UniProtKB/Swiss-Prot annotation:
The keyword Lipoprotein does not apply. The keyword Lipoprotein does not apply. It comes from Lotus japonicus (Lotus corniculatus var. japonicus). One of its GO terms (cellular component) is photosystem I. One of its GO terms (biological process) is photosynthesis. Belongs to the PsaI family. This is Photosystem I reaction center subunit VIII. The chain crosses the membrane at residues 7-27. Keywords: Chloroplast, Membrane, Photosynthesis, Photosystem I, Plastid, Thylakoid, Transmembrane, Transmembrane helix.
């Protein structure tokens, strides 16, 4: 259980920005700003 934060923290650090970028991309695609 001691190694859980060392794995979980970088995972959240990568997944959270990726989800933010994906949601922004879908938002722009839906509104046809491109």
């Amino acid at each position: 259980m001691t190694n859980l934060p060392s794995i979980f923290v970088p995972l959240v650090g990568l997944v959270f920005p990726a989800m933010a970028m994906a949601s922004l991309f879908l938002y722009l695609q839906k509104n046809k700003i491109f």
